[in-house]
Amino acid sequence: MKIIELILDEEQDDIGVDAISIVESPAIESDFVALKNQEIKLAEVDKEKKILMGALLIPNKPIYRNGGEGEYYIFFSKDTIVKASQMFLQNGKQSNSTLEHNQALNGLTLVESWIVESKEQDKSAMYGLDVPVGTWMGSVKVNNDDVWNEYVKTNKVKGFSI
């Protein structure tokens, strides 16, 4: 089967990551973690942070596609992932989110974005995520109770997709 490397051109504004989608079956085969508050003195206890953290893009990970050109795989290099993460923020798309790539969502914002530089010392490892160096990680704040209660808490969505 054909394998295609996707490359981004920083000069083309219409190319790049337009939104982060929360999905049931992420093509990158990596689920997110739903973070909740731990007990903190002098604060209300058991309030949920409503933050999802997970991989947005994994370098060199074959992603299956079936389209007009038939079946094939795509992948992103580490360099392309760095460009994609930077362009996403530079273009102010932190609040662009969808459900399963179909329905626009309000109240979801990318509040943290980083590239994994060390598997052992990265924040993702603290949460039990095993991702390779070069992975684009993100934390999304969910300020939408309907999305949180209907999709996140019920495990209808398990990861991110771009």
Across the structure, where does each feature detected by a protein language model lie?
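Signature of dsDNA virion morphogenesis modules
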Residues: 1-162
